[in-house]
């Protein structure tokens, strides 16, 4: 806000900083006038945006102040309204057509479009009327419903339309009046108005017209209505006591608002700069803030993980978000109807509920392993495997489902990874989300062992996530043995789990045709990002605050 002026020096400085738009307002408006956008448009030829900008600047300098603010409700003609104003509404066209029908040939052509031999004496059906009037069937049906309610039309037992009373209802008459008044403003819009052409203000309507307008105007989805409801705010201003002194100073300085604001090639060639005043510029005003484009930090981190793992010789794999219970759990030796299944509280699909099939021979092998261990050297879980249960569809709850899907086609030796979006019914907090990313990886080979796995986990935690301290904790996962939890120290959150890892059990690998050691891990990428990006709440990764992206170094 501008400081209050204390002398002629301040006043002289102010007037030379005024924009040409502000100067024109001060030079062409009386001190006792009520200032409005429409006034500046009509008197000064301003566009609406220029008028609003001039008011904003003058108000900031305390030269004008707000006088009145009011909500103005108006009704603007839609494209549908334009057509109705010139060609008639659907009700008008139907009533005119039925009251003074065209030649029998035209009616017969309309009827022949739908029926070979229409009984013309009983009138036309709604589809025949729609064809004859070239209107959409829904518009004809809606128009008939209104006219039938008003007792003007009726439908007989053969669904043919007849006129009961050929009079025009008060509603139709008022609708025609409103359309004609609005159309007149489309043809000759007022130059002093800052509202769109074809607009009627609620304040100028009678009570009866207002009731009709409520039926034919919509605020949203107005494409099929005659009018669109618009609510605009109208603000008027008055000059402050300061304005008179500023106006006098403008006169003394000889400023007109036509000063040159930019030295163009034409201005230099013509020599106009020699005779016209140049507008003063305040070089102390800070420049406009430049906001360069920036990529999202979390998206960059996801790409960083991929780049590092590819550089280590890994191949990326992917899979569907909607998964079957088979690949999400059964193929990982997680028993059906067992507490171990509660590790992942999943989202099941409402429709469709089941996949058509599960590929063989993997279904039979996995079922046999669950029931009796098969050739894995295990006793299995000793229950009857439910082949219908395993086809249930759900949102993938763990990235390890990708590993299970790709084990049958994996090369030996081979290294694979994926960035998987997973979904669980978790309580959202600083380290948990209901949908999150995991980085999933497997390494197959005869020389794979726990030492290999620990080394890989350290690379993931320290070199990729940027953890300063890590530790390995024994854990339990139904599909690995041994099972290891990877923990990292966060500066604000303390120690927390990054994810789990281990060597896949034979009950997982054998049914899928793999007979060499396989190490696997599934780490929470969101938690890795807490360390890498220096934040303490995973919810910040998905924040709508664009300023946090703009200010990122």
UniProtKB/Swiss-Prot annotation:
Chief location of this protein within or outside the cell: cytoplasm
GO terms of biological process kind: phenylalanyl-tRNA aminoacylation
- Give the signal sequence positions: none
Database matches in PROSITE patterns: AA_TRNA_LIGASE_II
Describe the protein's quaternary organization and the partners it interacts with.
Tetramer of two alpha and two beta subunits.
Q: What is this protein called?
A: Phenylalanine--tRNA ligase alpha subunit
Cofactor comment: Binds 2 magnesium ions per tetramer.
Enumerate the GO terms in the molecular function aspect.
ATP binding; magnesium ion binding; phenylalanine-tRNA ligase activity; tRNA binding
Name the domain of life this protein comes from: Bacteria
By its UniProt entry, which PANTHER family does this protein fall under? PHENYLALANINE--TRNA LIGASE ALPHA SUBUNIT (PTHR11538:SF40), PHENYLALANYL-TRNA SYNTHETASE (PTHR11538)
Q: Taxonomy-wise, where does this protein's organism fall, top ranks first?
A: Bacteria, Pseudomonadati, Spirochaetota, Spirochaetia, Spirochaetales
Q: Where does L-phenylalanine bind?
A: 400, 479
Its EC top class is: ligase
Can you supply one Gene Ontology CC term for this chain's record?
cytoplasm
Its UniProt entry gives the catalysed reaction(s) as:
tRNA(Phe) + L-phenylalanine + ATP = L-phenylalanyl-tRNA(Phe) + AMP + diphosphate + H(+)
Similarity annotation: Belongs to the class-II aminoacyl-tRNA synthetase family. Phe-tRNA synthetase alpha subunit type 2 subfamily.
Per the entry, which co-factors are needed?
Answer: Mg(2+)
Q: Where does Mg(2+) bind?
A: 481
């Amino acid at each position: 806000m501008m400081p209050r002026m204390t002398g002629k020096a301040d006043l002289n400085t102010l007037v030379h900083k005024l924009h040409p738009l502000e100067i024109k307002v001060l030079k062409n408006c009386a001190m006792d006038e009520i200032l409005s956008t429409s006034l500046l448009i009509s008197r000064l030829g301003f566009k609406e945006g220029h008028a609003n900008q001039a008011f904003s600047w003058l108000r900031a300098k305390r030269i004008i102040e707000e006088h009145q603010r009011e909500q103005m409700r108006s009704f603007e003609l839609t494209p549908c309204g334009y057509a109705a104003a010139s060609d008639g509404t659907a009700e008008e066209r139907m009533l005119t057509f039925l009251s003074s029908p065209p030649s029998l040939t035209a009616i017969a052509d309309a009827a022949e479009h739908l029926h070979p031999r229409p009984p013309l004496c009983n009138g036309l059906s709604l589809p025949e009327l729609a064809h004859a009037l070239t209107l959409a069937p829904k518009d004809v049906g809606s128009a008939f419903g209104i006219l039938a309610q008003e007792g003007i039309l009726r439908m007989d037992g053969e669904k043919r339309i007849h006129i009961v009373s050929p009079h025009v209802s008060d509603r139709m008459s008022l609708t025609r009046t409103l359309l004609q008044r609005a159309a007149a403003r489309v043809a000759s819009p007022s130059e002093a108005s800052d509202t769109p052409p074809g607009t009627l203000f609620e304040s100028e309507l009678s009570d009866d017209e207002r009731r009709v307008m409520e039926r034919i105007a919509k605020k949203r989805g107005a494409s099929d209505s005659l009018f669109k409801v618009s609510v605009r705010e109208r603000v008027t201003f008055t000059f402050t006591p300061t304005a008179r002194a500023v106006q006098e100073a403008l006169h003394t300085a000889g400023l007109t608002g036509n000063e040159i604001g930019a030295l163009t090639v034409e201005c230099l060639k013509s020599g106009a700069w020699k005779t016209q005043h140049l507008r003063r510029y305040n070089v102390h005003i800070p420049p406009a803030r430049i906001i360069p484009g920036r990529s999202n930090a979390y998206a960059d981190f996801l790409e960083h993980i991929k780049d590092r793992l590819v550089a280590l010789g890994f191949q990326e794999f992917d899979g569907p978000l909607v998964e079957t219970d088979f690949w999400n759990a059964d193929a990982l030796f997680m028993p059906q109807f067992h507490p171990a299944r509660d590790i992942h509280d999943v989202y099941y699909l409402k429709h469709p509920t089941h996949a058509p099939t599960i590929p063989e021979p993997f279904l039979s092998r996995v079922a046999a392993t669950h029931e009796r261990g098969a050739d894995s050297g295990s006793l299995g879980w000793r229950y009857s495997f439910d082949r219908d249960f395993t086809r249930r569809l759900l949102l993938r709850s763990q990235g390890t489902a990708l590993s299970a899907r790709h084990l049958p086609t994996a090369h030996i030796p081979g290294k694979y990874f994926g960035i998987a979006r997973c979904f669980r019914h978790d309580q959202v907090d600083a380290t948990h989300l209901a949908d999150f990313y995991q980085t999933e990886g497997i390494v197959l080979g005869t020389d794979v062992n726990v030492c290999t796995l620990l080394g890989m986990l350290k690379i993931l935690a320290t070199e990729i996530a940027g953890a300063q301290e890590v530790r390995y904790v024994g854990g339990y996962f139904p599909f690995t043995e041994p099972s290891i939890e990877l923990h990292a120290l966060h500066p604000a959150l303390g120690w927390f789990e990054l994810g789990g890892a281990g060597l896949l059990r034979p009950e997982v690998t054998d049914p899928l045709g793999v007979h060499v050691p396989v190490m696997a891990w599934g780490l929470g990428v969101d938690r890795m990002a807490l360390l890498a990006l220096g934040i303490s709440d995973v919810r910040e990764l998905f924040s709508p605050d664009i300023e946090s992206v703009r200010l990122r170094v």
